[in-house]
């Protein structure tokens, strides 16, 4: 008699867990940004977790990851657009780099080879470079991916990557003894560009065709401009910026992700800052993510 009774109870149990939750509508911790050539913008949200798509000034969830650790993009940290216009994303939860397919699903490119992917850069031939903050390496792999990417350079605390037209890779470091900006030639030779440490907590770097570079600095509440001869100066500083992290090119402008105020700014060449899209600030939601096991003891975004 117990079996029929149990079945009846299960059938009568309300299916609250099966009810679909409403789609998120607001940023939680937007820390990385990338723009397509057509103006569509993608934003990595560490605390959502997942990726937003911004089109015509409106944001929508592009990919909603699980909150379960060791699942794809549970700890998304960086984005890039590849040579064919596909979205790439680096995730420290699964130690992986993903490419989104035509169905909008992330497909892994390695077999969990990356430690903490902090930045991605893609060459014109599709070669993918990944900055690994945990292993202090720059990994290189072909467009189709590789089970074990090739070690391209060893640089301490790499956080940002950008390529120039000649195929040189520019690496932004937090604390390397060889300086905070280093250039890696196609043959792997490393040259120090900024040999000292003018940046407080740099996160991302962008290089323009004329050699000018820009760097987000979380602790200095600013975006730096670095001249082609390697001289840094603060380009924009203070309000409305709070603690900028993400940075990318968008036409002649830059896009800046400021996670603590849940805002994506558009930064024009004349230093004008305008809000592309933002969400109301929630002190709890914008708290810095809890470091994961294996995360090196570097300062978190503030």
Pin down the residues of each PLM region.
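Short loop/turn segments that connect beta-strands within beta-propeller blades
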Residues: 54-58, 100-105, 141-146, 184-189, ...
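A short loop-to-beta-strand structural motif that recurs across blades of beta-propeller domains
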Residues: 50-52, 96-98, 137-140, 180-182, ...
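An edge-strand/N-cap motif at the start of beta-rich repeat modules
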Residues: 18-44, 48-52
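Conserved beta-strand positions in repeat-built beta-propeller and related beta-rich domains
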Residues: 41-47, 87-93, 128-134, 169-176, ...
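Bacterial N-terminal signal peptides
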Residues: 4-14
């Amino acid at each position: 008699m117990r079996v029929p009774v149990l079945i009846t109870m299960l059938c009568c149990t309300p299916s609250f867990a099966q009810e679909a939750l409403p789609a998120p509508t607001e940023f939680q911790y937007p820390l990385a940004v990338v723009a397509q050539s057509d103006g569509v913008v993608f934003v990595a949200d560490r605390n959502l977790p997942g990726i937003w798509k911004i089109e015509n000034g409106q944001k929508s969830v592009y990919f909603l990851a699980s909150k379960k650790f060791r699942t794809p993009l549970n700890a998304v940290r960086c984005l890039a657009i590849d040579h064919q216009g596909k979205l790439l994303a680096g995730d420290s939860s699964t130690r992986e780099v993903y490419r989104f397919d035509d169905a909008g699903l992330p497909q892994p490119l390695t077999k969990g080879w990356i430690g903490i992917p902090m930045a991605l850069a893609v060459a014109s031939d599709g070669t993918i470079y990944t900055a690994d903050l945990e292993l202090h390496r720059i990994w290189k792999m072909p467009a189709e991916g590789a089970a074990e990417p090739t070690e391209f350079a060893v640089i301490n605390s790499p956080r940002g990557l950008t390529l120039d037209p000649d195929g040189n890779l520019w690496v932004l470091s937090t604390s390397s003894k060889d300086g905070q900006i280093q250039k890696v030639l196609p043959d792997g030779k490393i040259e120090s560009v900024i040999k000292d440490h003018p940046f407080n907590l740099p996160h991302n770097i962008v290089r323009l065709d004329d050699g000018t570079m820009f760097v987000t600095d979380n602790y200095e509440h600013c975006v730096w401009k670095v001249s082609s001869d390697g001289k840094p100066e603060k380009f924009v500083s203070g309000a409305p910026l709070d603690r900028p992290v993400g940075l990318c090119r968008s036409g002649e402008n830059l896009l800046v992700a400021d996670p603590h105020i849940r805002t994506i700014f558009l930064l024009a060449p004349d230093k004008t800052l305008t809000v592309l899209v933002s969400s109301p600030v929630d002190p709890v939601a914008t708290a810095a993510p809890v470091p994961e096991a294996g995360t090196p003891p570097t300062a978190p975004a503030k």
